[in-house]
């Protein structure tokens, strides 16, 4: 196994002696009659005995009140309540628009002049790039900066949208200067002016024509909302919970005197090994996959599609005349304990691509989301027709794959991609629905798993329905896979992060039976900037430095560790089936790190490190810097937006944040209003039943409510021509990530019912082949036409 560490001594091995308690596993369920708590001696049971996976939303409660039972089908069961109805619960944030009248009318000549200046600005960038390209100003391949640029790669459509957005923003800046608008109101006052009435009218996105009776999603998510067909579409702007705080009101980053450097803020984050003994690393992996499904904010590239270099190869600043206008490098202090030893004072960072405003008005900048906003499995299938078609086999509804040794199936390989690390083992890149498929091995494993399952189901459906052609097999299988991704997210993943109480408040709990009727075309399913840039990056705290490789189901044959910092953008190790299956076992037993302000070195100091460098980038500093690039207001403003009283002093944060983090930030920030949202996310006390804090959970719950109630194709919705039948929906509700892993692994035969939680008496080891891990009944998809 290439690059896998040698087997460590006994003292370094994780203690997993409890996971195979054979007496317990021989009698996985204690037997006897099911027993569930009742409301009283003569009253019916409060809870129902169900197969364990149907009680996933209440797993945290079951850990402390282990109400197990034997389900009616003889499988391991648990006692939990039914959910019969749910209500829509989005748009909780107060109206915060600062749309104000302009101080005077703008003349046609002034408008023309502003547009001319904007176009000249783009031409100046083009001239700079021509000169820079002749001087080879681009990150060298196999550097951390190059890998980071590949992660934030802008597609051709994304680049085109970005340059259109840039012209609109530069014209807005010129108009704001002409009108002498204060930064607080500049981005709002200009929204009275329409781009369509200028020479920039071509940047406005047209509305697609929709077929309201279509049975399947479009490739780019257009027409999901018939009333607003561009909502949620790929290459659209992110939504905002609160207006941005740009320094100039238009696009200048959130930077002003008194704000601490992000390097200094990042240094309050430490690498302390503090595992969460209840949650597995699957929580982090799944969250990353979902993040890549609903959002991809690219960074600007040159007009000829080259990555932009902002620092020298050894981490120094470029001279001003050689620095690209779209660079926004991170300043690293000379006394930085880690980077100082290498003389690094500059980290590459390029500004995020901005999109033309949806309303085609002038005003402040909104960043581009290159992926579809809906939770539609686009991470597997792609967010554009071009990508989706490139991944298909066009036979039997299957996806393209690579087959090694006759039976080992992995993702297709693109020999033309150059963004994977090249060393003695690597160089070959996988391709998938999302550009970041090769980012790290745990994520790539999930990509392989889902493509395997798609092809397995497509083959089975072709036997059940011999008359179905390739297109129907592909679309029906994709529809099933998308439903499974949604169900696992809402039934298993979100309860482990948000807890059942908050999910109930936001109408996020899956129903026990029947349909939901909460689809609302007025709900904008767009991903919010705050979710993408800060709140959903909570998972970076869960990352661990290495993966443990267990070579068989006895968990006695240990294959060593796979260190994250050694395998960024290098999927070559997954060409070995032993490693692939070992990583699946790790996802069942490996614990996540505790959610707090501690983050491992693999991402804090070695992000995207290549074999040719001694250091990588700093993910924490990058997250903070990205928030300022996007003009994200401070944490305190979101505290108020989420219904709490805004803090007047740092000590007012103590009921919400851990004291240690409050003490650190009060010496860094001059004002409590300045505290960056992301560092606030890391410092919060957890809400009841969840692992994240009140502001983080507020932003996340609102987002997932939007992704449910704003998605016409959401798997539980009834009353639509494309809705699943009641029997099909019930079978989908019986599914779990455990079953998905059982179906797609090669040598994993034992698993726990809920792989988001570590093995325990309420989450026992069970065989993949038994009743305890229900299968999807594909016979329910047998068609008469």
Model segments located where?
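Hydrophobic faces of stable alpha-helices that mediate helix-helix packing
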Residues: 451-455, 632
């Amino acid at each position: 196994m290439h690059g896998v560490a040698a087997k460590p001594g006994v003292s370094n091995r994780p203690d997993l002696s409890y996971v195979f308690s054979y007496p317990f596993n021989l009698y996985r369920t204690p037997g006897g009659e099911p027993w569930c708590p009742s409301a009283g001696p003569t009253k019916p049971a409060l809870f129902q005995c169900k197969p364990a996976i149907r009680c996933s939303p209440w797993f945290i409660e079951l850990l402390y009140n282990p109400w197990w039972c034997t389900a009616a089908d003889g499988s391991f069961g648990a006692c939990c309540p039914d959910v019969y109805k749910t209500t829509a619960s989005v748009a909780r944030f107060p109206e915060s628009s600062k749309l104000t009248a302009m101080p005077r009318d703008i003349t046609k000549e002034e408008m023309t002049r502003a547009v001319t200046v904007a176009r000249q600005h783009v031409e100046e960038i083009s001239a700079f790039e021509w000169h820079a390209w002749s001087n080879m100003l681009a990150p060298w391949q196999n550097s951390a900066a190059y890998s980071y640029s590949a992660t934030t790669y802008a597609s051709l459509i994304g680049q085109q949208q970005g340059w259109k957005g840039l012209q609109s923003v530069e014209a807005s800046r010129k108009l704001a200067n002409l009108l002498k608008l204060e930064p607080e109101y500049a981005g709002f006052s200009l929204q009275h002016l329409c781009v369509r009435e200028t020479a920039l009218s071509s940047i406005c996105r047209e509305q697609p024509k929709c077929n309201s009776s279509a049975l399947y999603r479009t490739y780019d998510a257009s027409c999901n909302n018939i009333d607003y067909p561009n909502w949620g579409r790929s290459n659209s702007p992110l939504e905002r919970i609160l207006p941005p705080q740009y320094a100039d009101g238009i696009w200048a980053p959130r930077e002003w005197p008194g704000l601490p450097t992000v390097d200094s803020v990042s240094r309050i984050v430490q690498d302390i090994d503090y595992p969460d003994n209840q949650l597995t690393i699957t929580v982090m992996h799944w969250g990353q996959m979902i993040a890549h499904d609903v959002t991809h904010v690219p960074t600007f590239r040159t007009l000829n599609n080259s990555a932009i270099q902002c620092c020298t190869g050894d981490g120094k600043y470029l001279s001003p005349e050689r620095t690209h206008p779209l660079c926004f490098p991170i300043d690293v202090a000379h006394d930085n304990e880690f980077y100082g030893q290498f003389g690094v004072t500059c980290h590459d960072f390029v500004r995020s691509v901005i999109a033309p405003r949806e309303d085609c008005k002038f005003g402040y900048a909104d960043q581009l989301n290159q992926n579809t906003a809906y939770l539609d499995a686009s991470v597997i299938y792609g967010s554009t027709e071009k990508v989706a078609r490139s991944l298909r086999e066009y036979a039997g509804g299957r996806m393209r794959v690579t087959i090694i040794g006759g039976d080992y199936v992995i993702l297709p390989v693109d020999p033309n991609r150059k963004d994977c690390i090249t060393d003695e083992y690597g160089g070959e890149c996988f391709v998938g629905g999302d550009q970041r498929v090769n980012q790290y091995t745990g994520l790539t494993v999930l990509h392989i798993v889902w493509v395997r399952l798609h092809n397995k189901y497509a083959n089975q459906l072709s036997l059940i329905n011999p008359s179905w052609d390739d297109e129907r097999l592909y679309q029906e299988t994709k529809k099933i896979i998308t439903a499974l991704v949604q169900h696992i997210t809402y039934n298993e993943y979100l309860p482990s992060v948000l807890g059942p109480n908050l999910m109930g408040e936001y109408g996020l709990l899956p129903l026990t039976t029947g349909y939901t009727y909460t689809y609302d075309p007025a709900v904008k399913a767009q991903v919010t900037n705050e979710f993408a840039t800060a709140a959903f990056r909570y998972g970076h705290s869960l990352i661990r430095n290495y993966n443990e490789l267990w070579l068989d189901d006895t968990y006695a044959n240990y294959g060593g560790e796979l260190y994250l910092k050694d395998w960024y953008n290098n999927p070559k190790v997954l060409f070995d089936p032993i490693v692939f299956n070992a990583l699946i076992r790790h996802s069942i037993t490996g614990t996540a790190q505790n959610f707090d302000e501690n983050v491992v070195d693999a991402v804090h100091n070695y992000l995207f490190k290549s074999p040719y460098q001694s250091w990588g980038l700093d993910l924490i500093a990058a997250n903070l810097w990205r928030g300022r690039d996007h003009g994200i207001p401070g944490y305190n403003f979101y505290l108020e937006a989420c219904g709490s009283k805004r803090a007047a002093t740092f000590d007012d944060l103590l009921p919400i944040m851990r004291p240690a983090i409050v003490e650190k930030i009060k010496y860094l920030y001059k004002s409590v209003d300045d505290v960056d949202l992301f560092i606030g996310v890391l410092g919060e006390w957890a809400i009841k039943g969840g692992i994240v804090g009140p502001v983080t959970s507020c932003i996340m719950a609102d987002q997932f409510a939007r992704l449910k109630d704003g998605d016409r194709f959401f798997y539980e919705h009834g009353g639509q021509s494309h809705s699943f039948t009641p029997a099909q929906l019930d079978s989908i509700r019986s599914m779990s990530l455990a079953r998905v892993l059982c179906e797609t692994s090669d040598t994993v035969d034992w698993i726990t019912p809920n792989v988001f939680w570590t093995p325990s008496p309420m989450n026992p080891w069970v065989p993949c082949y038994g009743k305890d891990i229900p299968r999807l009944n594909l016979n329910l998809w047998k068609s008469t036409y």
